């Protein structure tokens, strides 16, 4: 998925205001930079006042450059959504370490050092002055929490989202409880909507330090309301009550940082940093970037990467463009598509036939004929620098003698075995006049299905059991002795037929007689319109098929007569995509008039494959052979749909009709109209709620629920 000039790799996190993605920015000559993209959620992007405030704060935060602050590189808009491009930190946030602390106590010196580094970054922001006027800006973070402090695997501590929380905390934009746990880090003056200063961030850092030491929050409260009551009117639980081994000096730092009266609190983050650094020095333990990195590697050994994004998933988990291209390349090598309406690369001057075989990755440019159930098919090559050379020579394909019993065995063989046998390709010969025209194949055994697909839908199944015989000729003259044309049509699914080799030296055309096994005996059916618009008769008496060929050099004619005692039904010939496209530079196959004989056009004209319809033999007894027609495709009426958006407070994993959609927030989804069952799960709150929602076609429905009130 692309956002502006950035390619999304995978989703990292989501919150009440935005969702965060790992992204890449590409440049010339292979330049590439990994960064993080934070995209504002659509419902906030629709508020012009919010966007204006957010843009102003983004400009301000972009000026902050400090080792302990995540740097902002870019701000932009794409597809109606605003985003920030910022520095990528390879490592966890402190929330993961808090969870670790609930299981195993973290060293006090380590906790103090990490919080001191965050305090240094915040102190820099608090003291930042306007570049033009030199006046202090009085910038306050207002949203310090373990989620917004990151620790890289190199031991660097970084404060993120500086300035964005200030926008969210303005007046009517205080989204209490939307981002989980934020209320727990607010001092009393912030909850009372009093004037705030940098001591707001001091209090929040004190709560973060308390959690790192104990794995718990300072108050035993579970809801936002009870937490607010505790912050305003209750004393926090002493850290010594939960962890007696915490040194007294560090307990005193916590008492001062968490004072309800801000006048008794540290005046700024710089003062808090100083006391924490003194404590670290007093322990006598070296705690620097190297020691922090070692601890992170020990406690958080790996960060599981989400699956790369795919184009169809959009903003959900999943892929970069290079991965999508690689998947596309792999798919094209496994099963090249067959499109009969829009040709792409012209076929080389070898064989033209319907294609539905995997490409050989070892030889991607040479057309490789493959025998599938007795039908020889050639693989269309991909374009390559060697293609012109390959197209300059005819490719002669030699097939073994066709026998009814051999063809039946080939049809009953597994597809993988059939593909690997029956065809040999020899190197180009010196004679340019040699051209191979393949116009026949054996039928499947009784009751079997023919394996010769003609459209992508028919690639893995075949239901036709028709048979007929054709002969085709090819113009063989061309200035310079080169081949003027090649065979443009190969009839698919033929019971009887011949392999005719036509030469440009006036040699006769000699079809080879094949005696196929009888067709499948099916019950009597009424006449069914065929693909060509003709009616398929119920009875199919024996037919005589006459095919003619004319040499384009001197007008000499050769009219071999081929007849079988097998009942046949006329059928429109199946030809490859490029054989029917004039601009592909290849011969075109057309229906011939019903009279006997046929002629090939002169040099440069199209090849005409002629056939005659079946003629009744006068036998009163109907032939039991039947034509098995594909049932007409029924178009399914489109289901009316509407859009459903989920606004859950604080968040939840949403399932719709038993299918998991993901964790909120996420974009609105398109669902069929009607009543649906919604399940919301929030493990942190211990909530599992099921509701129903009615969706109307063509309308947007918003599902709102506050899980904390449930």
Swiss-Prot record:
Residue ranges of the region described as 2 X 12 AA repeats of P-[VA]-D-S-T-S-P-T-T-P-M-P: 337-369
- Spell out where the chain crosses the membrane: 483-503
| Cellular component aspect of the GO annotation | plasma membrane
The chain's Periplasmic topological domains, given as residue ranges, are 504-710
Q: Which residues bind ATP?
A: 12-20, 38
Task: Write the record's keywords in alphabetical order, separated by commas.
Answer: ATP-binding, Cell membrane, Kinase, Membrane, Nucleotide-binding, Phosphoprotein, Repeat, Serine/threonine-protein kinase, Transferase, Transmembrane, Transmembrane helix
Membrane topology classification = Single-pass membrane protein
Q: What is its main location?
A: membrane
Q: Which reaction does it catalyse?
A: L-seryl-[protein] + ATP = O-phospho-L-seryl-[protein] + ADP + H(+); L-threonyl-[protein] + ATP = O-phospho-L-threonyl-[protein] + ADP + H(+)
List residues of the Protein kinase domain.
Answer: 6-280
Please give the Gene Ontology molecular function terms for this protein. Answer: ATP binding; protein serine kinase activity; protein serine/threonine kinase activity
Cite the post-translational modification comment: Autophosphorylated on serine and threonine residues.
Q: What is its EC number?
A: 2.7.11.1
* Subcellular location per the Swiss-Prot or TrEMBL entry: Cell membrane
Query: What are the start and end residues of each sequence repeat?
Result: 337-348, 358-369
Ranges for region Disordered: 308-349, 404-461, 507-634
- Active site: which residues? 143
Question: What does the similarity note say?
Answer: Belongs to the protein kinase superfamily. Ser/Thr protein kinase family.
Its biological purpose is as follows: Pkn5 and pkn6 may have reciprocal roles in growth and development. Pkn6 may be a transmembrane sensor of external signals for development.
Name recorded for this polypeptide: Serine/threonine-protein kinase pkn6
Q: Where does this protein come from, organism-wise? A: Myxococcus xanthus
Source species taxonomy? Bacteria, Pseudomonadati, Myxococcota, Myxococcia, Myxococcales
């Amino acid at each position: 998925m692309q956002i502006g000039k950035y390619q999304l790799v995978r989703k990292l996190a989501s919150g009440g205001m935005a969702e965060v993605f790992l992204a890449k920015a590409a440049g010339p000559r292979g330049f590439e930079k990994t960064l993080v993209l934070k995209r504002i959620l659509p419902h906030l992007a629709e508020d012009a006042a919010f966007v204006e405030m957010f843009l102003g704060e983004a400009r301000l935060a972009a000026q902050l450059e400090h080792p302990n602050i995540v740097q902002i590189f870019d701000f932009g808009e794409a597809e109606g959504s605003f985003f920030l491009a910022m520095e990528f930190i390879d490592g966890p946030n402190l929330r993961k370490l808090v969870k670790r602390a609930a299981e195993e106590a973290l060293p006090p010196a380590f906790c103090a050092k990490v919080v001191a580094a965050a305090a240094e970054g915040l102190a820099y922001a608090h003291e930042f002055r306007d570049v033009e006027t030199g006046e202090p800006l009085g910038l306050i973070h207002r949203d310090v929490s373990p989620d917004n402090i990151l620790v890289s695997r190199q031991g660097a501590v970084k404060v993120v989202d500086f300035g964005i929380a200030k926008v969210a905390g303005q007046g009517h934009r205080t989204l209490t409880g939307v981002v989980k746990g934020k209320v727990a880090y607010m001092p009393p003056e912030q909850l009372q909507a009093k004037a705030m200063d940098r001591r707001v961030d001091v209090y929040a850092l004190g709560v973060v330090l308390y959690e790192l030491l104990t794995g718990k929050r300072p108050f035993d409260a579970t809801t936002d309301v009870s937490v607010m009551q505790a912050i305003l009117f209750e004393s926090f639980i002493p850290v010594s009550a939960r962890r007696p081994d915490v040194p007294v000096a560090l307990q005193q730092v916590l008492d001062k940082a968490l004072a309800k009266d801000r006048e008794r609190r540290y005046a700024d983050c710089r003062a808090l940093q100083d006391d924490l650094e003194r404590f670290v020095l007093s322990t006598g333990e070296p705690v620097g970037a190297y020691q922090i990195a070692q601890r992170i590697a020990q406690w958080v050994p790996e960060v599981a990467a989400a699956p790369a994004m795919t184009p169809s998933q959009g903003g959900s988990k999943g892929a970069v463009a290079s991965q999508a291209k690689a998947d596309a390349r792999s798919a094209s090598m496994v099963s090249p598509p067959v499109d009969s309406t829009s040709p792409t690369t012209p076929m080389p001057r070898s064989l033209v036939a319907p294609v539905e075989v995997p490409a050989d990755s070892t030889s991607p440019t040479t057309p490789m004929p493959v025998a599938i159930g007795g039908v020889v098919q050639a693989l269309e090559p991909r374009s390559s620098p060697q293609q012109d050379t390959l197209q300059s020579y005819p490719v002669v394909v030699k097939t073994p003698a066709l026998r009814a019993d051999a063809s039946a065995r080939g049809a009953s063989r597994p597809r993988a075995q059939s593909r690997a046998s029956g065809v040999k390709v020899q190197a180009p010969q010196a004679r340019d006049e040699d051209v191979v025209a393949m116009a026949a194949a054996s039928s499947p055994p009784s009751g079997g299905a023919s394996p010769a697909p003609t459209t992508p839908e028919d690639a893995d199944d075949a239901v036709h059991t028709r048979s007929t015989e054709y002969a085709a000729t090819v113009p063989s003259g061309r200035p310079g002795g080169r081949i003027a044309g090649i065979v443009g049509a190969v009839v698919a699914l033929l019971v009887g037929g011949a392999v005719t080799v036509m030469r440009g030296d006036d040699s006769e055309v000699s079809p080879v007689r094949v005696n196929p096994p009888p067709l499948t005996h099916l019950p009597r059916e009424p006449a069914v319109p065929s693909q060509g618009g003709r009616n398929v008769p119920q009875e199919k008496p024996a037919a005589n098929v006459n095919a003619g060929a004319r040499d384009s050099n001197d007008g000499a004619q050769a009219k071999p007569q081929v007849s079988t005692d097998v009942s046949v039904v006329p059928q429109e010939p199946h030809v490859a995509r490029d054989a029917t496209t004039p601009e592909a530079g290849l011969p075109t196959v057309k229906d011939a008039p019903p009279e006997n004989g046929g002629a090939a056009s002169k040099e440069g004209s199209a090849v005409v494959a002629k056939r005659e319809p079946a003629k009744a033999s006068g036998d009163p007894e109907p032939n039991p052979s039947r034509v098995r027609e594909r049932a007409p495709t029924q178009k399914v009426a489109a289901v009316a749909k509407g859009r459903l958006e989920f606004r859950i407070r604080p968040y939840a994993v949403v399932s719709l009709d038993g299918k998991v959609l993901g964790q909120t927030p996420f974009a609105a989804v398109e669902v069929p109209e009607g009543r649906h069952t919604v399940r919301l799960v929030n493990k942190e709150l211990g909530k599992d709620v099921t509701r129903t929602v009615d969706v109307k076609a063509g309308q947007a429905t918003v599902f709102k629920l506050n899980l904390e009130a449930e």
